[in-house]
Swiss-Prot record:
Positions of the UniProt region annotated as Disordered: 1-57
Note on domains (UniProt): Contains an N-terminal anti-parallel coiled coil formed by two BRMS1 chains; this region can form homohexamers.
Protein source organism: Mus musculus (Mouse)
Stretches with biased composition (Acidic residues): 11-32, 40-52
Assembly, per entry: Homohexamer (Potential). Interacts with SNX6, HDAC1 and RELA. Interacts with ARID4A. Identified in mSin3A corepressor complexes together with SIN3A, SIN3B, RBBP4, RBBP7, SAP30, SUDS3, ARID4A, HDAC1 and HDAC2. Interacts with SPOP; this recruits the protein to a ubiquitin ligase complex containing SPOP and CUL3.
Similarity-based family: Belongs to the BRMS1 family.
Protein's recorded name: Breast cancer metastasis-suppressor 1 homolog
Keywords annotated in UniProt: Apoptosis, Coiled coil, Cytoplasm, Isopeptide bond, Nucleus, Repressor, Transcription, Transcription regulation, Tumor suppressor, Ubl conjugation
Gene coding for it: Brms1
Annotated Gene3D superfamilies: 1.20.5.1500
Amino acid sequence: MPIQPSGKETEEMEAEGDSAAEMNGEADESEEERSGSQTESEEESSEMDDEDYERRRSECVSEMLDLEKQFSELKEKLFRERLSQLRLRLEEVGAERAPEYTEPLGGLQQSLKIRIQVAGIYKGFCLDVIRNKYECELQGAKQHLESEKMLLYDTLLGELQERIQRLEEDRQSLDISSEWWDDKLHSRSSSKAGDAMPPSKRKKAPLVSGPYIVYMLQEIDILEDWTAIKKARAAVSPQKRKADGP
């Protein structure tokens, strides 16, 4: 059989049950209070967050405006400094004191000196070449003049000799013609005298041994042919001398 508790124990157990129920009720109430306080704190924190956000936003905007203002001031200051530096450099360049101007200027002046020296040397060479060319042309002109003078002298000498030869031939032809006419006249006079002489006293033609040329022409025709041959030979001889010459 099961053992039943006594009355005292039963009362104690009931008292303990009531105290446990009271404790549970208090715990529930504390939890409700805690949840309520949390809700209130959350509402308060949300309100505080909005205010903090606005406050921080306004602070950030003000800081940004300050930064923009400082940046504009720095930018303006930098612009003024750069402008003053450029003006200073411009003044130095105008006064020929700027290193950006003096250093390249020194290099250019050195290059100018070198180029002037090279130009002077080149000028000397050009003058020597021109002088040598002038002397060569002058010498060539003198040689050409001398050769032309010699050629002219030879030409005139040949022409004069040709004229002298022609005059000599003409004189000889005239002498021959005069002799021929004298002989002709003498022969005519002698033939007339021979006709008057008796045939026994006439001279007989001499007999010639060896080659003998019998001319079928009259003496006047032979004389004309001989004169023409002499003139032709006199005309050919100067041309032959020119062809044989240099």
